[in-house]
Amino acid sequence: MTSSSRGYQRVDSSGDGGSLLMEEEGDNPHEALLHRNNDDYASTYHHVGVEYDSYEELERHEMDDRVTEIPEGFHRRQRRNLIYGDDVATDEELRVLRREALFGEEVTRAGLGRAEYYEDSHLIHSCDKSGHEDIDDESDDESKDEDEEEEETGIRKFAKLVLPHVALVLLTCTYTVIGALIFYSVEQPHEQMMKEQQLKLIYTRQNEFVDDLIRLAAGNETKRYEWESLAERHMHNMSDQLFVAFEKYFLTSNEVKKNAATETWTFSSSIFFAVTVVTTIGYGNPVPVTNIGRIWCILFSLLGIPLTLVTIADLGKFLSEHLVWLYGNYLKLKYLILSRHRKERREHVCEHCHSHGMGHDMNIEEKRIPAFLVLAILIVYTAFGGVLMSKLEPWSFFTSFYWSFITMTTVGFGDLMPRRDGYMYIILLYIILGLAITTMCIDLVGVQYIRKIHYFGRKIQDARSALAVVGGKVVLVSELYANLMQKRARNMSREAFIVENLYVSKHIIPFIPTDIRCIRYIDQTADAATISTSSSAIDMQSCRFCHSRYSLNRAFK
């Protein structure tokens, strides 16, 4: 060690244990750059002006590029590991550096430099720790915000799914109530006035009849035909007046007896009338009799009927989807209960389809609710209406069942009408739900039959354009059938008919041998076709997926 040039060689961590390297030229030491390794901390001094190694720079730049490509979550975990890891310098290392400073100026500089480095690094890590704690708090806040956003998005999705249906129902109800209010405000005053006029006319006719009877009695009239003619004339006038009052102004016998008019156009009856209009039931009692009321009825129906039909169809679709869901769960439960007998009832699958992952348990058909089940639901609901109306109205069960069926099918003859206003809203709820159930039945059963009708129609259309080979010529089946019918019309004799049948059976109907099921197909192996007649029999099966036929050897028991 000399005064002109002194140096401490740094040994690598894999060598003698990591010494300090200090290089000086003269009395002016150069600035040092401290680098932190994964295993230990060391200080390395470089001469000013000396360039870094190109390989180290390249590696550093590559690492920088790779770090930028790492996701943010990985950076967060890495920073947490650095914060709570064992990389921070301990107090024992600081004491060792202070002891090394007692052995010389150079060692003191090196030791103090290293101690300052560790103190600075400890301060930096403490700052980083506090900073990362803030980052963790921010990340927790961000996660909470994300959870809240997910909840909000879930609520929004649910709202988007439910709100249109709820809004449609509320719109229909609001529209019906507004229409009922207008009907009530227009028809109720006019109805009260007209009923009072009709009662006055009825009692006027009655008083006239009594006056004529008194006049005949005062004149000592004893001829019978005079009394009969007088009574007949007044009775006809009275019956005409009563019929008009009942038919046109819905006057009842109790009102005539008490000589007091009661309100037919109450608010409940107005809502009931509005519902019967928009649902196209139309009982016909009561009806608007004023011009303003009739004009409003037309305008109200133009928008109310489509709106109500759409709403009822939406409710029916909702019920049909839930009924299909319940029926599917019923089938699953039935499948689980009867799973031990599944092998006996399962359909056959050929080896080719089985090799492609198609098995016996694969469900390739949509769940279709049987028609009798839907019809049973409709009948049960109608019977429930019969029981309900027999309790609410003075009707028998059969009369109530008849009214319920007429209402559910929107026929609405009007011969039976609920009269009790106290139960009007219960009856309205029953009617609306019944119309939704009727729509559900049409949606579940009617669509299936419509599909079948279209299927047969397409098949018939395809059959018309089918080709047949007759006498070496290709002709349409429709043309062949027309020619045969013309020939049959010309040859009505039995002999010609027999010859024609023989011709048809010979040239049109292909020959089908009786043992066709025993004939081996071209793609069937010889081993599968070899069957012992003494111990087994041939059972031709059809594949569930590709519909190809193949034979199974089934031994006699």
Swiss-Prot record:
Entry GO MF terms: outward rectifier potassium channel activity; potassium ion leak channel activity
Region (Disordered) residue spans: 1-34, 128-151
GO aspect biological process, one term: potassium ion transmembrane transport
Bias kind Acidic residues: ranges: 134-151
InterPro entries named among the record's database cross-references: 2pore_dom_K_chnl (IPR003280), 2pore_dom_K_chnl_TASK (IPR003092), K_chnl_dom (IPR013099)
Transmembrane regions listed in the UniProt entry: 166-186, 295-315, 369-389, 426-446
Glycosylation sites: 220, 237
Superkingdom per UniProt: Eukaryota
Any Pfam family matching the protein: Ion_trans_2
Membrane topology, from the record: Multi-pass membrane protein
Chain ranges inside the bilayer that never cross it: 270-290, 397-417
Protein name: TWiK family of potassium channels protein 7
Gene source species: Caenorhabditis elegans
Lineage: Eukaryota, Metazoa, Ecdysozoa, Nematoda, Chromadorea
